[in-house]
Amino acid sequence: MMIPVTKPGDKLIIIRQFRPPTGRLVYEFPAGLINPGEDPVEAAVRELKEETGYAGTVDFCTPRVFTSPGLSSEFVHLVRMTVDLDAQTDLQTHFDESESIETFLVPQDSLPDFIRRAEAEGCGVDTKLYMWAITRGGFLD
């Protein structure tokens, strides 16, 4: 899972896609599987380009972190990326056959309101998106 932040503008790149287990559209950060022979950084760069069309550079990558250790062995790497909007020339996406993804550029200070609107629309919001908003000072009042 990556946290792509733009420059200029300090906006988050967020996607919305249908997630069958939830039965609804879900807002989330771009993410994807690591292919055989790939490391987490390479996978993050590839997935961001495939899902959003944006190219980014990796600022940091965590080791494995477990998403729900009480229920499963699933893990992710959290990858923070910078996307230079002025350097983007080819925003073509390359979705998997089952994917239909919309991309949103959201100012970080507007994220709590963005999440509230998403929920009012009946959409789901991924935990990691909420956590980013909380750690940036949202939802604390």
Question: Which stretches of residues belong to each language-model region?
Answer:
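Unchanged
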Residues: 1, 32-123
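Residue-level signal for alpha-helical context at structural boundaries
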Residues: 28, 62, 129-133
